[in-house]
Swiss-Prot record:
UniProt xrefs under PROSITE patterns: TFIIB, ZF_TFIIB
Matches recorded under CDD domains: CYCLIN_TFIIB_archaea_like_rpt1, CYCLIN_TFIIB_archaea_like_rpt2
Keywords: Metal-binding, Repeat, Transcription, Transcription regulation, Zinc, Zinc-finger
Family named by the database record: Belongs to the TFIIB family.
UniProt source species: Methanothrix thermoacetophila (strain DSM 6194 / JCM 14653 / NBRC 101360 / PT)
Full protein name: Transcription initiation factor IIB
Gene3D superfamilies on file: 1.10.472.170, Cyclin-like
Positions of Sequence repeats: 154-237, 248-329
One annotated GO molecular function: zinc ion binding
GO CC entries: transcription preinitiation complex
ZnF (TFIIB-type) ranges: 37-68
HAMAP family reported for this sequence: TF2B_arch
Biological role: Stabilizes TBP binding to an archaeal box-A promoter. Also responsible for recruiting RNA polymerase II to the pre-initiation complex (DNA-TBP-TFIIB).
Amino acid sequence: MEEIERIREIERTEQEKIKERIKLQREKEKEEELDKYTVECPECGSRALVRDYERAELVCSECGLVIDENFIDQGPEWRAFDHDQRMKRSRVGAPMTYTIHDKGLSTMIDWRNRDSYGKTISSKNRAQLYRLRKWQRRIRVSNATERNLAFALSELDRMASALGLSRNVRETAAVIYRRAVEKNLIRGRSIEGVAAAALYAACRQCNVPRTLDEIAEVSRVSRKEIGRTYRFVSRELSLKLMPTSPIDYIPRFCSGLNLKGDVQAKGIEILRQAAEKELTSGRGPTGVAAAAIYIASILCNDRRTQREVADVAGVTEVTIRNRYKELAEELNIEIIL
């Protein structure tokens, strides 16, 4: 019996060694695969490479070196000149996305009662199609976890649409929320609160800052709960978020006030001078940005009132008056009202 046990132990050890070797081999192959796609310029080491599809060349945008000639075009073999042509000729589905609970990998049955050729489904087959559509919806969301994730991601998309946020911000917010779900951070907290906190964190990560008041306005939870949940999630997920800079708010505020490009450039210049003298630290970034825009609009003869700037920035007129007086005094800016 002891001999049999010893043989079995040796066999188990050998099997573990084989598994370990296979695992190491797979990791090595994965690293080689990644190295194949992370190309850098052999001359200057830059990764800012541009693919010129007309000449079939891979060019470094920093030093101009042609790294590869006659590379293979991995795009479609067909040509399309508008959106309708692209939709007709495309033979693949939408790209994978984190903003859908199943990452967009499942299929769905269209609500229109038409076949693949665009012909109307006969009346005797509509009942069957209705049942197929119903079961397809049930299969896509099969358990409570998927149902909650689908609800949270739809809530994220609704808030992002209301704030006019871009696709990359939505994807980042969805990834943050999924990480929170994996770490079981949702327990004891509302789904809407965690979704709003994830969106706020994504805005800061993507340098498209939105204030807590703006997030709270489009969500169904209070500003206090969003702030508390955001601090908890960012701490547990170790999110590296830099403090928001007033400069990040300048383009959006100028766009809301219909100001010209020179006013925006002047506002950024004022804020950079203020940052050098540490006038922006310890103050709300929206108030400082609003004051810089107010000063820039006067200097560029494209004046806006304090009330107009305050409405767009979401601050009070008193805040703008206090901040612009500080900036004008410390930076020696002469303002003629």
